């Protein structure tokens, strides 16, 4: 590799870029949740929780865990893992554990990307996932 890099160095750099991709997908998901609740409010319907929205994805990766749960948890991991002195006992860690991402996982964002997008790390797949989910969300929960 140019500059004396090795495979580990390349994966370290990819981990950051993929983590940013998950944060961007999370922002899209949060925007969809806000949109559906605005639509519901305009027709005097009760708001929907984020948890219910994430669970509405039609594709699960494990029992009760959807692709949207994984996107959200991976984004939260990426944003906050440097603050963690120890691995947390929270919803993010619980969801990641269901897809075998733990404190021992060297590259969590890479592992999550491979699960959702394949080994080619094509982040456009994340966009497709959240776009299709948003369309389903608007039609099913508005």
Where are these regions (language model features)?
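Short, well-structured hydrophobic secondary-structure segments
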Residues: 10-40
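Short, solvent-exposed secondary-structure capping/transition elements
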Residues: 30-45, 80, 84-88
């Amino acid at each position: 590799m140019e500059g004396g890099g090795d495979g580990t160095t390349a994966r370290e750099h990819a981990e950051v870029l993929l983590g940013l991709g998950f944060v961007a997908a999370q922002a899209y998901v949060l925007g969809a949740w806000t949109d559906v609740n605005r639509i519901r409010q305009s027709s005097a319907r009760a708001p929907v929780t984020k948890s219910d929205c994430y669970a509405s994805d039609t594709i699960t990766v494990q029992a009760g865990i959807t692709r949207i749960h994984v996107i959200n948890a991976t984004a939260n991991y990426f944003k906050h893992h440097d603050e963690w002195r120890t691995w947390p006992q929270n919803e993010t860690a619980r969801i990641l554990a269901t897809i075998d991402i733990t404190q021992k996982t060297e590259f969590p964002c890479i592992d999550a990307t491979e699960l959702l997008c394949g080994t080619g790390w094509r982040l456009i797949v994340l966009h497709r996932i959240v776009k299709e989910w948003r369309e389903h969300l608007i039609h099913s929960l508005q």
